[in-house]
Amino acid sequence: VAETDGSETDDWIAACLDTADRCWLAMTAIVGELGDSAVNQRPPLEGANSAYAIVHHCVELSRWWLGTFGCGLGLPRDRPGEFRATGTTDELLERVGQVRADTVVWTRRMIADGIADRDARSTTASADLATVTPHWVVLHVIHELAQHLGQLELTVDVLGWAHE
């Protein structure tokens, strides 16, 4: 591996943070448009999640992968409960704002210091947690955010069809 002055890593981190933030901005726009009642509605499909639950799950997966696994913060997580979560748009938007800010700090810390808590367990990811790299963790979080943004967009579409 060629030696660098660190600018490539800084550019990579900036690109990752920008991509994650674009997902968060799209999610918050959708949540803001839905309001308190609609954000908690589930589409009429077996196993479907509400918009609130989808975004809440994204907050929690980011906190776990970056904060707990990556930085060793031991943040509590109830993964099964994430999909039953309900609440107001204001509280959800506040939590998203906090995790967006934390993501910057946690990502930079994890990339610089390495993964802090490989023994943490609260994921269903099919990855070898003993060998994943900090870069893999960042890309995994972005992948999950993008995937769940698509799920959120489809959820809103299905709710619209169900009410027409």
Regions flagged by a language model, labelled:
Residues A2, S7-E8, R108:
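Generic cytosolic/nucleocytoplasmic N-terminal low-complexity/intrinsically disordered segments
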Residues T9-L17, T89-L93:
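Active-site rim elements
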Residues R84-S122, T133-A146:
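Acidic/histidine-rich alpha-helical segments that form the ligand environment
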Residues V1-T4, I13-T28, E33-E82, S122-E164:
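Short, contiguous alpha-helical
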